[in-house]
Regions:
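Charged, low-complexity intrinsically disordered segments
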Residues: 2-160
């Protein structure tokens, strides 16, 4: 009889794919208050308070400073790393007047037009940085160098 596969080890393998974030139970716990903040923007009165003074509105939420800083910077990639769920974060960019397409294009390092064209043509090319560890082992760029290179392919992870 074979042993049960380790689901945590399996999910951890996805961390090696640039730009891929599996929304796990751990990530959900990490981002609980962040996502609750985002959902609060469903109410008009909360959106008005948010627009009037973002920092003051965030002060009412028990989020980490890193989460608050990322919200204020509208760094959606960082917010995903900090437990944000893109469907909850949609409330933030909708409040800013951005469409899903506009917001997601900011995560790719591409203009909205270039991102839309890429997606309409079938999505990101399979060429480029496909594995963080393989790229490092091959002596490829790491850190911000790989991040910039990956952005052109739709990747923006800090740990490329």
């Amino acid at each position: 009889m074979s042993a049960q596969p380790d689901i945590h080890a399996y999910i951890a393998e996805f961390d090696d794919i640039p730009g891929t974030r599996v929304y796990t139970a751990a990530r959900a716990r990490q981002g609980y208050h962040l996502n609750q903040f985002a959902m609060s923007l469903m109410k008009a009165e909360n959106r008005e308070r948010w627009k009037a003074d973002e920092a003051a509105y965030l002060a009412d939420w028990p989020m980490t400073e890193a989460q608050k800083d990322a919200v204020l910077a509208r760094d959606y990639n960082r917010l995903l790393d900090l437990g944000g769920n893109i469907y909850f974060l949609a409330k933030v960019f909708s409040t800013d007047g951005l469409s899903f397409l506009q917001a997601v294009s900011t995560m790719s390092g591409m203009s909205t037009e270039d991102y839309a064209a890429m997606m309409n043509a079938g999505g990101r090319s399979p060429d480029g940085v496909r594995s963080i560890s393989a790229n490092r082992a091959a002596g490829g760029a790491t850190g911000s160098e790989a991040n910039r290179a990956a952005a052109g392919a739709g990747n923006t992870r800090e740990d490329c």
